[in-house]
């Protein structure tokens, strides 16, 4: 165990996502200390060695070591990447039975260390497992965050930017709802340079509208395509996790589409779901309730109902 100085991030699960996330943290100089925890201690130790050998190339070298749950005591943030991976043909919700028991063990072990920081959950189905983390930890809702639709939103902005030939950073558009098959695009609030995207395609005819629909389908189904081609997704979500981590540790008050607990916003209660939220060192400062059109409201409620239906099998609602 290192002597805690500066910001400490504990990464639980050093598979594809966890290791890629630690690599992103190192390359961006986000954390001062990174501890890697995995049931396979040799894997965690090997990753720590590998990352340490690249310290000289990092913008802000971090202390990196493989550890155990006791190291979570002084962590500012515990990021859970452990669990069963999604296989070809599986939906994210198919993973619940496999991962819920794993999460109970992980969260209880973290809390037993005396941990008083924030949880960030990456494992799928992320909305369900973020709710489980909140329940198992008994922490305030704002201190438990899921990666939500941060990657879906990034995919959306990338594909829209590609279609309109502008930088994705200049595309303002959100994917909200379940990180999964019932997620939805908020077309009513999407714009590029202040011009609504719906207005941009008005003059281009029906084919342009169909292309927007195809873009959303490609966003929604991207994970299935990547899993089919290479077995897993990890680079994109690792960078998304790093972005959330920076917002937390650097107290940025950044608006990101994370899995946040709703207790009234969007007309929903007692569910973690992907929505824009203000993120800082205290966790979720507030949920941003963007104005949805009637069709989007119906779609969002269907998405929330899907998640609640799964939660009801494991937690009293």
UniProtKB/Swiss-Prot annotation:
Pathway: Fermentation; pyruvate fermentation to lactate; (S)-lactate from pyruvate: step 1/1. Its EC number is 1.1.1.27. The keyword Transferase does not apply. Gene3D superfamilies: Lactate dehydrogenase/glycoside hydrolase, family 4, C-terminal, NAD(P)-binding Rossmann-like Domain. Its main location: cytoplasm. One of its GO terms (molecular function) is L-lactate dehydrogenase activity. Beta-D-fructose 1,6-bisphosphate binds at residues 157, 172. The modification Phosphotyrosine is found at residue 224. It comes from the Bacteria. Catalyzes the conversion of lactate to pyruvate. This is L-lactate dehydrogenase. It comes from Bacillus caldotenax. The gene is ldh.
